[in-house]
Amino acid sequence: MTPFGYLFIDIDDPRATPSPAGRALAFGCARSRSLTPEEIGTPAHAHIVADTVRAAMREAQVGAEDVALVIVKTPVTSHIPATAGAVRNTRVTSAHSKAVGALGAGLALGEVPEARIVREAFDTDHTLHAKRAMVFSGSELDCVEIMLLANRPGAAGELTVHTGFLKDVLDAGGLRALFASAGCRIGEDGMLADPQKVVATLIKSGAAPDGRVRGLRTTMKSSHLDMDKHVRATMSGVAGSILGHARIFISANTVHQAPPGGGLCACIVRGGH
């Protein structure tokens, strides 16, 4: 609800010492080559995502077990003309591109079997999902861009990153569990007792395919307003009631990023576990 942004800056500080907790926040970035129009939305696209995630892990000097969150930006369509004689794919939707990106990230992290990265699975086989990926798509790029957040052993600093799942858009308990696991205290009123420890909160929230929440119909799939806007507004209220403010990054559509109707939440805390 509050317009703002998070800025990540990598600074070489000779005064920095390893975290007393033994690990601290590290991030890595990577960018793939340009995809051809024929590759976008295909298993080859997913493998390019996986390779780019692995490159970001190398840049951050971490293994898959250290990764807390992978942020993926992936192309929807391409402005590049189709190769002569090639058959261009039918239009790749935002949801389809996010599905490909999520399964590619899951492949790189060992969460999705390579044998199940097939065209028929994308945005269809919802038994498959990554566990630590938030995926975004756009027509303004023709490549895959990755930003990866991890807790690297021996890293300097006092920040750590933590990830958890949400059952649905009303799962306040899931958010409280995330903050508690990060070392924050929950007050008797259900709000954070030490909100100053939380320096960033990121949420990817979704809606079940039938639009129901806990068995009841909702208006989220009505035609007058995009469902993602309903989801973001609902999640803003739920998360804001715990944090005590609305400076929260919230996005919608969790295809292959969580079980259907569920979501992913992450926080960066200072002096946490």
Which residue ranges define each predicted feature?
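Terminal domain-initiation and capping elements
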Residues: M1-H273
